[in-house]
Structure formats: structure tokens, C-alpha cells
Amino acid sequence: MNIYKAFLITTIGGLLFTAAWPTYGFFPLVFLGLIPFLYVNEFYKEKNIFLVFFVGFFIWNITSTYWLSYATIFGYLFACTVNSFMMTIVFYLFRKVKIKTNEKLGFIFLITIWICYEKLHLVWDFSWPWLIFGNVFSESTWIIQWYEYTGIFGGTLWVLVTNILLFKIYSNYLKGVPSKRLIYTLISILIIPSIISFGIYKTFEEDGEIKNISIVQPNVDPYSEKYSITNNDNLNYLKNIIEENKIKNSLIIFPETFFSEGVQINSYYYNELSNKIRDLNSKHKNEILSGIELYEVLYDSTELKEFSNKIGDNRWINIYNSAIYFSDKTDYYHKSKLVVGVEKMPYRNILEPILGQVLLDFGGLSLTRGFQKRRHAFKSSNYNISPIICYESIYGEYLTDYVKDGGKVLAIITNDAWWDYTEGHRQHFSYAKLRAIETRKNVIRSANTGISGIIDSKGDEIIKTEYNQETILSGNYKENDIITFYVKYGDYIYRIALFFVIIIFSYYLSLKLSPRK
């Protein structure tokens, strides 16, 4: 096989993954996407195979997440390059282990190290889990109802095993070796989980207490308008929304950073904004959840946190992208999965002394945002709400901590206008369906210029808005206190995978380092 053919084959693999990806994709193609890479690994023997793998994965990344370029060209190219490089390293390690050990151990290593790579993208500072294999089924929720037991890594495992079995069957065909047993195994692995899932989907009865909800989608352009609107302007907008639509006895949610002017934490409870909202709630018997920018000014260096920003001599500021809840008491939560390069500098202690403060400016203050260490559910006498802010909604195990803290509904507030009419905001809405299944919780979602809506605990859309539409959705959702297997045990598939990676890679190293006889 020459290099041009190898490049063509891995490019086809990358395009198969793109063609499978939601929301426009045909998901069964994901069961074929890895086969071209496995084929090249088997039949291409040149030393530049790393580059061949990289090109295929890069094609997948740039075509699947092209919408990132609408917000930042640099961020788009950086994310695609780093992610493709990591995928290539994983596949190259698989190649080395397979050659040194044997085919069976090699394939087990590929499955387990790929899962570990995906988990890394959920926890490290350059976090970018958008292309985790398990996300690919978000528009076909009838087939992955078992995510309540496995989370998205169950989907990743399914994709990897199926690709490997299909490749082995094809490889045996080329060699004239019968594959009857492998074919039966493949059919079982494809059909049995699908039947089980469809059965759950058809028989699942959603339980819970019915609640009233009004979801506001203001449709404000974040590039030109949002950060020039005062909190008082938005307060008047909020008041008019409630009174013109006669909203009473309801939970009302507004999107991320709806109040973007900034409110000092030590005065938020007593300031004019909070007092007026509480008066409105008292008058109309409502409760309000909204995005807000909170901050605190520090004058004592002993009180500094890792995300504190210096703004003068002996003065620092902590800024938070927060959610605030006005009920019979007032509560707040700080977004803690921050967007790399926009809300936080990765590995700040290392990079900031070298690069300085180089966060991208999309409005507001271009300073590192703060976070909190624990998830926190808002609780009142009427509601138990998990306040999930934007990017946090794509982290499965992370969200289970809200449920463990008493959250009975997943409330996502976001601002998805950065990417225009692309797959970006559509995929972000679609991925919320996975969280609904994993936790068996309803999702209520307020997006500023995105897609707002309600998703039930099977992952079905109950109601949703269009993009670029100023509107209010009024409806009902259900709160329940279900604790799923996945909520209880989290990403246990990753922990099992890590065990196998350590064992197999240690064995590989022992073979590599041992003296030849």
C-alpha cells in the first residue's frame, strides 16, 4: 500500500465519523468509521503511519466541529489539532502494543485506552469532550436507553467493539478464513442492546410531580448587544414578561448571564435588583432562576484563590459566571466547567507567566472566571433544581453530583448564539438528551439565541423553540427523586478500562525492555 492510498483510506474513515454525527448524521455509520484506520494499521508498514492516522482524525475533527470557527478561528484550529493529535497517539500506541504482544491483547488495549483518552477529555484543563463516541446517539435515544446504567462510555464501548468485529470479519474474508462465530457475535452485540433499549423505551413510565414552567429566550446578540444592556434594563424586561403573559405560580428560568452587568456577592441579597425580584415573586407567586455575573473584590492576599485576578495594588477580583435562584430564600451557584481560552486559562500557573492574560474576548470582562468545588442543587418548598450552566451540560458524571445533592430536574441555562445557524447549538441541545437518560430526569433549558425547551426523562423532546427567536415557552415538566445506577456509580466503565490499560501496557513494557534471547 502506498502513502496516497493510505491517506485516502483514513480520510474516508474521518468522513464516515462526520457523516454519523448528530444532528444531521446517520448514526449507524459510526460502526464503520474505525475500520479504515484498522485496515491501514494492518496493511501499511511505513514509518510515517503516525501522519496517516493524524490526517484521518483531523478530517473528522475539522468537518464535525467546523462551527467553532464562527466564534474563533484560532480556538477551532487549536482544538481540532490537539484532539486529532491525541486520537493519533492512542491509535499509534495500539499499533505498538498489538505488534509486540498479540492481536487479542492489542484490540483490548485499543478499546480500553480509547475510553481512558475520552475520560481525560472530561477532566483535564484542555477539556474538549464533544466528539466522545457515546455522544453520537443523541438523536436516536430509543437505542441507548441503557445509558441509565452505563453513561456515554457504554456507547463508546459499543462503537469500538462493533468496529473491531467488523474489521476482523473483513480481514478474515481477505485471508479466506471463515468467520461464522464472529458474525454471530457481531449480530448479538448489535441486536441485543438495541432490543433491550427499545423495550425500555416503549415500557418506561415517567413518574414524578408535575410542575409549571415558563422558559424565556430573550434572543439578544452576544456580540453586539448583550453586554451593553444594564441589569435595570433586564429587570424591566423580566417584569414586563411576567405581567404581560400573566405568569403566576410558576418557575421561570432565564438564560446564562441574563444579568451581565455584575453584582457584588456580599451585597446581592440586599441590593435593589434582588429586592425588586423578590417583590415580583411575592406578588405573582413565582420563583425565578437566572444567569448572572457575580464578583467579589479582595484586599487581603491571604484570601486569594487560584482564579483571582489582580486589578491594582493590593486589589484582586474573583468573577463568576453564576446562576441565581429567587424563591423563599435566595441562593446562587458558580459555573465550574469553564470554557478553555474564554473563561479560563488552562494550567494557569504554568502558562500565564509565559503568555500573560490571553483570554479571548466575547463581551464582558476578559478575566479568568472562578468556580466552586462541589455541585449544588437549588431547593425550595416547591422545587428542587440542578442549575447547569452552558458547557457543564456535556459532562455526564459531573452532573450526577447535582442529583446526589437533591436535584430533581436538570435546568440548563446557556448562551448558544456564538455559532450562528450551525450544528453547534443543535448538538448542544441534543447532548442534553443523554443527560436526561443517564439521570432519568427532565431537562428544562433556557438559551439566549439557541434552542430552549423541555426534554423528558426518556430523552424525548416535549417542546422546543427555534434558533434566533425571542419567545416564552410555557408548559409542564416532572420532578422525581430517581437515583439511577449511573448516578450512583458514575463512570465505572472507565475505571475498569484503566485497570486493563495499566496491566496490558505494563506487560508491553516488560516485553519491550526485557533482553532478547
Regions from the PLM with identified roles:
Residues D125, G208-I210, K283, E438:
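Short, well-ordered coil/turn elements that cap or connect secondary structure elements
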Residues A79, N83, Y227-L235, T422-H425:
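Flexible, glycine- and charge-enriched loops at secondary-structure boundaries
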Residues P255-K517:
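Solvent-exposed soluble domains appended to multi-pass membrane proteins
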Residues V40-N41, W67-L68, L93, I241-K248, ...:
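Alpha-helix C-terminal capping segments
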Residues V90, F94, K239-I242, I277, ...:
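Generic structural signal for well-ordered alpha-helices
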Residues W21-P36, W60, Q217-P218, N249-Q264, ...:
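Short, conserved active-site loops that position catalytic residues or coordinate cofactors/metal ions
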Residues M1-F204, Y421, A432-R435, A447-T449, ...:
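Membrane-embedded alpha-helical bundles of multi-pass enzymes
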Residues T141-I143, L190-N281:
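Membrane-interface segments at or immediately adjacent to transmembrane helices
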